[in-house]
Curated annotation (Swiss-Prot):
GO terms for cellular component: cytosolic small ribosomal subunit. It comes from Sorangium cellulosum (strain So ce56). PANTHER family: 30S RIBOSOMAL PROTEIN S2 PROKARYOTIC AND ORGANELLAR, SMALL RIBOSOMAL SUBUNIT PROTEIN US2M. Residues 243-252, 263-272 have a biased composition (Gly residues). One of its GO terms (molecular function) is structural constituent of ribosome. Keywords: Ribonucleoprotein, Ribosomal protein. One of its GO terms (biological process) is translation. It comes from the Bacteria. Belongs to the universal ribosomal protein uS2 family. Residues 235-278 are annotated as: Disordered. This is Small ribosomal subunit protein uS2. The keyword Ribonucleoprotein applies. SUPFAM superfamilies: Ribosomal protein S2. Gene3D superfamilies: Glucose-6-phosphate isomerase like protein, domain 1, Helix hairpin bin.
Length: 278
């Protein structure tokens, strides 16, 4: 699928789209994190209602950051391992030419990237062996063993192929679910952009997007617009003649040379959930 950049001036997340997708439905009030209080409008039938004015304002901030990050030559790592997010994250990351993790986050994916890169090199070797006819010269038992190894590496590292170094940012579906990924990013000062539900700790996120991180329509809406930000940034880089390394979509995947984030941590900037999931 060819990525098409949004038109300049398009508002990233219209209020009507947020309502239709159920982005405003938080968790049960008894499951909330009090740090999310500034982003909560109220409660209805035991469910916290997220303040969508905050969502639109903070998403615009995140959108501008991501556009600038990619426009300067960086790449974004999309992370979403929960079942309802996996296909959406993979599809949108590929559309934007970005990297992704949709199965289990392997410890050290960022903090021990040298080991991860060894796995990526091994995956590339096995793919080459399969394509160039090497398998045909091996015993069937050996081919079966190598294929199992290749399939396992593809499952956990396939979305990182071509990634030569740290991303300029990570985009996360559910900080509570992806706590290890966020911990690694924070250790390395990699900015975190995240759909942050009412049970999450916003202090761990640089660019909070208050919203429902369980409903499929909510995840799809926000993830698609994050991908749009990346597409817009890539187009901006192309227009300015700053080259262009491709990511998971297939390309050189050189190391991101810059970290465009300036400033400290803290992206706050100043029943119905399951019904919305279909």
């Amino acid at each position: 699928m060819q990525a098409v950049a949004p038109q300049p001036g398009d508002f990233p997340l219209p209020l009507r789209s947020l309502l239709d997708a159920g982005v405003h439905f938080g968790h049960q009030t008894k499951r909330w994190n009090p740090k999310m209080r500034p982003f909560i409008y109220g409660a209805r039938n035991g469910i916290h209602i997220i303040d969508l004015d905050q969502t639109t304002r903070l998403f615009k901030r995140a959108y501008d950051f991501l556009t600038d990050a990619v426009g300067r030559g960086g790449h974004v790592l999309f992370v979403g391992t929960k079942r309802q997010a996996q296909d959406i994250v993979q599809e949108e990351a590929r559309r934007a030419g970005m990297y992704f993790v949709t199965n289990r986050w392997l410890g050290g994916t960022l903090t021990n990237f040298r080991t991860i890169k060894q796995g990526l090199d091994r995956l590339r070797t096995l793919e080459r062996m399969k394509e160039d006819g090497t398998y045909e010269q091996l015993l069937k038992k050996e081919v079966v063993r190598l294929e199992k190894e290749r399939e396992r590496l593809e499952k956990y590292l396939g979305g990182l192929k071509g990634m030569g170094g740290l991303p300029a940012a990570i985009f996360v579906i559910d900080p509570h679910q992806e706590s290890i990924a966020i911990s690694e990013a924070r250790k390395l000062n990699v900015p975190v952009v995240a759909i942050t539900d009412t049970n999450c700790d916003p202090d761990l996120v640089d660019f909070v997007i208050p919203g429902n991180d369980d409903a499929i329509r909510s995840i799809r809406l926000i993830t698609a617009r994050v991908a749009d930000a990346c597409v817009e940034g890539a187009q901006r880089r192309k227009d300015h003649g700053e080259g262009g390394q491709q990511a998971a979509g297939g390309g050189r995947g050189q190391r991101d040379e810059i970290n465009v984030y300036q400033g400290g941590r803290g992206g706050r900037g100043g029943g119905p959930r399951q019904q919305q999931a279909s």
